[in-house]
Each structure stands twice: as structure tokens, then as C-alpha cells.
Amino acid sequence: MAEFTYNPVQLVLAGQNVILNTTISCPKGYVLHRNESGLVILRGIVNNPQSCFARYQVTFNGNIAVPEDGTAGEISVALAIDGEPLQTSKAIVTPTVVDAYFNVTSTAFITVPKGCCFTIAVENTSASATPTTPAPAINVQNANLVVERVA
């Protein structure tokens, strides 16, 4: 098991990753992370030579809000695999005022083929309300990503 956290408030632009800086690393080297990065690498190391994959349960929990200089509206985060948001992991909230924090949780099982590596992250997937306005940035506080090897 590995755990990555970042407790202070951080501003995350649309399409960018949540930064993680405190690490409780995996002692076997299955999960890798560089501090002050939002990227975590899952390795497809197998203990049984007959196995074709390694499976991980990845869970993100954190508080998200629209920043004070933003406009209240729908915001979201999702787990991303190799830069692509996993839509089934998207956590969506709709604050009616700015700087109002909502707790969100997202979990996914990720299967890594033997000998491969996947890069995972937590991404701001908030979309623009109209085609002419940019997608909103979000504040993230108490970010916590837990990776557990399950098979």
C-alpha cells in the first residue's frame, strides 16, 4: 500500500493534476512517486510467473471548491491513466457560492499488464459552462491518494 497527500490549499487549473507531496511509499517498489509531482507510477510486476497482470485499487479523497475569484458552478476531478481521465471515476459537485468546499471521493480498479507501467494522477476535469469561457480552475485541499495492490 502507498499513500500520497497534500494538505494545504492548492489552485489546480483545468486539465492539470493535483500535486502530492507527502509520501508513504510502497516498500516493494510496485508504486513510484516523486515528491511535488502529481504523477504516480503503477508497475506491472507479478509475483506469480503464471500471472498476466497486477491489479491496484486507487482511491482519491479531497475537498474541492471554486476559488474566490471564480464563478460558482459545476466542478469536477477524476483519476487519469496515462493522461486520460477515467470518466467512471469522475467526482462532480455544483457549488452555489465560491470558496465553499465539498468532499469528493473516487475509486477505480486499475489492471496493469505484466511488464508494463501506467501513470496515474488526479486531474481537474471541470468543463466550461459556455464555449466562450475558459474551464474553471479549482481549489483542492486535504488531497489524499491511496494505492493498494489487490492482485
Language-model features and meaning:
Residues 1-151:
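Extracellular jelly-roll beta-sandwich "head" domains, especially the C-terminal globular C1q domain
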